[in-house]
Amino acid sequence: LNFIGMRNFSFSFNGAWIKSKVQFKEGGNNIDRPMQGQSPYLINTGLFYNNPDKGWNAAVLYNRIGKRIIGVGNRYGSSSEGDARNIPNSYEMPRNSIDLSASKKFGKLEIKATVRDLLAERYYFKQFEDVTVNGQARTIEEVTRSYKPGRSYNLAIAYSF
């Protein structure tokens, strides 16, 4: 990023917009859906600082994934018979993650500190079912599982012989 006066800094961006589809034969119990485990988008960015003259190195990384199927649902029965039962797909919901790292060299000695998952946002897993209540269509959203993994810290000291 020297061109904007940020000497020793660099920036990276990687993003993907993905459309996947698993198709089934008509008349079967399965409903067309996105591929299991495939996020519809991914975002990875990073801001890096590297000053070899002073021995400093640092990074801030941001990652996000889109809502993705982690468990494929199923449909039983036939809607023409009026007794169809739908078990919805289970989704991992989008979440933001920021990682930090910094290191400093003192000759042959290097000290490095990292913080992973600085935001420590909860993981949410949900199911969505479309229903009709009193003639009105609506979606029921249920959290089937959630947990907060927390952030992790690391301090490393290395010496080169």
Short names for language-model regions:
Residues 27-34, 84-89, 140-145:
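Extracellular loop and loop/strand-boundary signature of outer-membrane beta-barrel proteins
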Residues 1-72, 156-160:
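Gram-negative outer-membrane beta-barrel transporters
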Residues 56, 99-103:
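A broad helix-preferring feature
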